[in-house]
């Protein structure tokens, strides 16, 4: 009987040790980087660069090419997303829209339009929580719930890009979301544009879009911003004049795969 107890105890200890070995840190990290200067790519630092690379996340495109990738966070609708879509259609630019459950449920017609016009719909979670406070099952539920609602509208099940709510994440969150098949997309260009009661005018948004531009830039823009909606047309026009081209996150992923060494 004693030997059976010993074996059981040993098994429990081994299982516990394996679980500890597999555990990863869950301390919250706020995404950030040293902002672009003189149109050079920004740098998130050695530690962050190493962490996100480990889990196939990214915040830059090909920094050797004057390419820009436009991404938008859609937590709720403030009346400006249609104008943003009009501008993208005019310039034949494909955007990636990271949507919450609230946005999808509240604005099915805009989700349908995004899909019909060839844009990418990314996942911004259902309730916009700090994912570091959630269990693995809760994280999956947050993301699956968005996908299910989008599928009801578009009939598509290709929502594989994720942007962590509030830009807060951890190694644990990166690990779990990668396990679920997501690629986490951060950003290299951003500014304070989400305060709807403190909009600063078209010039403010335009200046940031131009000043922070750099090769391989991934822009984060909030569609609740009147400033962004008013500045986007001129910004795209003038960035093209500066030699920039606009590509989609799908284009970037295809190029990354093409650059991988063959086995």
Swiss-Prot record:
Give the signal peptide range. 1-23
Q: Per the record, a Pfam family?
A: Polysacc_deac_1
Q: Which GO terms describe its molecular function?
A: deacetylase activity; hydrolase activity, acting on carbon-nitrogen (but not peptide) bonds; metal ion binding
Q: Which SUPFAM superfamilies match?
A: Glycoside hydrolase/deacetylase
Site residues, Raises pKa of active site His: 193
Task: Pinpoint the NodB homology domain residues.
Answer: 66-247
Name the catalytic site residues: 73 (proton acceptor), 222 (proton donor)
- Which domain of life does the protein's organism represent? Bacteria
Q: Report the EC code(s) recorded for this entry.
A: 3.5.1.-
Q: What happens when the gene is disrupted?
A: Spores have no muramic delta-lactam structure in the cortex and cannot germinate. Mutant spore peptidoglycan possesses many MurNAc residues lacking peptide side chains.
Q: Which residues bind a divalent metal cation?
A: 124, 128
pH dependence statement: Optimum pH is 7.0.
Q: What induces it?
A: Expression is sigma G-dependent.
GO BP term, example = cell wall organization
Instruction: Name the family.
Output: Belongs to the polysaccharide deacetylase family.
User: What is the additional note?
Assistant: CwlD and PdaA are necessary and sufficient for muramic delta-lactam production in B.subtilis spore peptidoglycan.
Q: What functional role does this protein have?
A: Catalyzes the deacetylation of N-acetylmuramic acid (MurNAc) residues in glycan strands of peptidoglycan, leading to the formation of muramic delta-lactam residues in spore cortex, after transpeptidation of deacetylated muramic acid residues. PdaA probably carries out both deacetylation and lactam ring formation and requires the product of CwlD activity on peptidoglycan as a substrate. Is required for germination. Cannot use chitin oligomer (hexa-N-acetylchitohexaose) as a substrate.
Protein name, entry field:
Peptidoglycan-N-acetylmuramic acid deacetylase PdaA
What is the scientific name of the source organism?
Bacillus subtilis (strain 168)
